[in-house]
């Protein structure tokens, strides 16, 4: 993955931070190497961040690289170590990925807003969306489909989902469900359950 405005040292620090966080929470990657390419990210981008034009940069370059790398690394990590049916059980991959992305943001960037630096501009101060936390974007994008009555069950096979649900809404819904269960049960039970699930599969 590349971010032209970052030095090699900044990239290495971001990669190290993400890899250590995932190893600490999901376990060490069992193989000697993992490939994380720009093409992987482009196939499965973080919607919201990737749709903004280059001249509007509400987030710092190092933050953008870190979040993009986190999403892509988690995706490749989970698809390599979990032996699930990618058609029927795709929501499990997506749910674990989004759940740990939410936890990562809560751990390292709890004050980051969904609109980034735009939240500091006086012109936008009166809008609720500007004050929304970064993790609120998952529920906003999921609810976009739910309010249009186009929500589909997570148990539906991947090939039966409409495009928006396949690419965005179902992924975010799965992650939000795991995060909700974590909040409801407490005691890091969900994190431990995910670790056990990965070990068993």
Question: Which residues does each PLM region occupy?
Answer:
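An acidic- and aromatic-residue-enriched active-site/binding cleft used to recognize and process polar
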Residues: 39-41, 102, 132, 195
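Amphipathic alpha-helical substructures
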Residues: 4-5, 30, 158-201
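A generic secondary-structure signal for well-formed alpha-helical elements
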Residues: 26-30, 76-81, 85, 100-112, ...
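Glycine-rich, acidic and aromatic/proline-enriched surface loops and short helix-turn segments
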Residues: 24-28, 41-46, 139-150, 174, ...
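Single, functionally critical "micro-switch" positions that shape active/binding sites
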Residues: 70, 74, 93, 114-115, ...
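Juxtacatalytic substrate-recognition/specificity segment
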Residues: 1-89, 96, 100, 162-163
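Short coil/turn segments at secondary-structure boundaries
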Residues: 33-37, 116-117, 192-195
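Acidic/His/Gly-enriched intrinsically disordered linker/tail segments
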Residues: 88, 92-176
